[in-house]
Amino acid sequence: MAFEEAMNRVFHKKICLRCTARNPWKATKCRKCGYTKLRPKAKESRG
């Protein structure tokens, strides 16, 4: 149970496409720059 909880805390975020800031999952705009285009944080590496 603790592992799933930790994974959710790490990966259940949204990333701003303009400034790459981490935002809460329920965010509709970036907390730093106000940009509205957010993507979910990648769960797998891109390598």
Curated annotation (Swiss-Prot):
The yes or no answer to whether the keyword DNA repair is present is no
Which Pfam families does the entry mention? Ribosomal_L40e (PF01020)
Which Gene3D superfamilies does the entry mention? 4.10.1060.50
Q: Does the keyword Ribonucleoprotein apply?
A: yes
**Gene Ontology molecular functions:** structural constituent of ribosome
- One cellular component term from this protein's GO annotations in UniProt: ribonucleoprotein complex
Family per record: Belongs to the eukaryotic ribosomal protein eL40 family.
Q: NCBIfam families, from UniProt? A: PRK04136.1
What's the protein called, per UniProt?
Large ribosomal subunit protein eL40
